[in-house]
A protein has these predicted regions:
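Conserved anion-binding
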Residues: 13-28, 97-177
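C-terminal helical cap(s) of enzyme catalytic domains, especially alpha/beta-barrels
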Residues: 119-127, 215-269
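Catalytic cores of alpha/beta
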Residues: 79-106, 186-223, 236, 240-241
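Conserved, mostly hydrophobic/aromatic
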Residues: 11, 45, 53, 99, ...
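Short catalytic helix/loop segments, enriched in acidic residues and glycine
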Residues: 24-43
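Glycine-rich, proline-tolerant flexible connector loops at the mouths of alpha/beta enzymes
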Residues: 50-71, 111, 171-180
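Alpha-helix-loop-beta-strand connector modules within alpha/beta enzyme cores
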Residues: 63-86, 121-137, 180-208
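Structural preference for beta-strand elements that scaffold enzyme active sites
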Residues: 5-9, 52, 81-85, 105-108, ...
Length: 269
């Protein structure tokens, strides 16, 4: 079987988690505290065997100031030993370069691929297509790249970034996000057939059955999936075991988190 990666998602708003895990009774303090300390949440997903963590900058997507979120994602990366892939919307290539230089393993580029293609090519050469990837958030197959660019089709965007040297893509449809209704497999097959880029899909996954369906597309280059809401609501069988263990170990976990937070503190980005 072709290896397939499941990546938990953390959404950040002003440096705080937008979601909180629904734990077993007795873990209320553990999980509520994590909303204020995303580093702890990243460490928890790692302890639960995450091989990568997906972080989304909700502030930037909404056009708001995201200084706190930018600082937080660097702290998170320094606190875990697996890659963090960071989806943010920045106005210039230099903002992505600073994140990479600060240690964030992977950044997902969108708008600036259109507004500064030469700068993106340079960034790819400097940091490699493994660390510089591209993000598509589509609606009815259209991608909104902001007032300076407007709408392009997802196919136009994917072919464009492939020509720049991109070799990995995160793809989601707005209607999938938080819906727990699964993903449109025909859409994924269509975008997978455009290039030979590796593809991570995101949004909509609600159950192991949804995962198995996506995994069938692995021969097309779909090698991973980002899961948010379903992971926080414990919809997968293994999670019940994790939450029961965490309920018993809550004081010990907090002690570990406090120690890790002290060791991983950093200066401003």
């Amino acid at each position: 079987m072709i290896p397939f990666l499941v990546i938990p998602a953390i959404d950040l708003v002003q440096g705080r988690c937008a979601r909180c895990i629904l734990g077993q009774p007795g873990t209320e303090t553990l999980y509520s505290d994590m909303s204020d300390h995303p580093v702890e949440l990243a460490q928890l997903w790692r302890r639960e065997n995450a091989k990568a963590i997906h972080v989304t900058d909700i502030d930037a997507i909404k056009g708001l100031d995201d200084d706190l979120t930018m600082q937080q994602v660097v702290r998170m990366q320094r606190a875990v030993d697996v890659p963090i892939q960071f989806v943010t919307v920045q106005k210039d290539v230099e903002s992505y370069r600073r994140l990479l230089a600060a240690g964030v393993y992977r950044v997902a580029i969108n708008r600036v691929a259109w507004t500064d293609p030469d700068g993106v090519r340079e960034l790819l050469d400097e940091y490699s297509p493994s660390r510089v990837i591209f993000g598509v958030r589509a609606h009815n197959s259209d991608v909104d790249l902001g007032p300076d660019v407007g709408m392009v089709t997802d196919e136009e965007f994917i072919r464009h970034v492939y020509e720049l040297g991109g070799r990995r893509l995160i793809y989601t449809e707005c209607d999938w996000e938080g819906s727990l209704t699964g993903q449109n497999l025909d859409t994924i097959r269509r975008i997978a057939g455009l290039t030979n880029m590796r593809i991570t899909t995101a949004g909509g996954i609600a159950s192991p059955r949804d995962l198995w369906a996506i995994q069938e597309l692995a021969p097309l280059g779909v090698d991973s999936v980002v899961i948010g809401r379903a992971m926080y609501e414990n919809t997968f069988p293994c999670q019940r075991i994790w939450r029961e263990i965490e309920a018993e170990l809550e004081p010990e976990l907090h002690a570990r988190f406090d120690d890790d937070m002290e060791q991983s503190s950093i200066s401003r980005l």
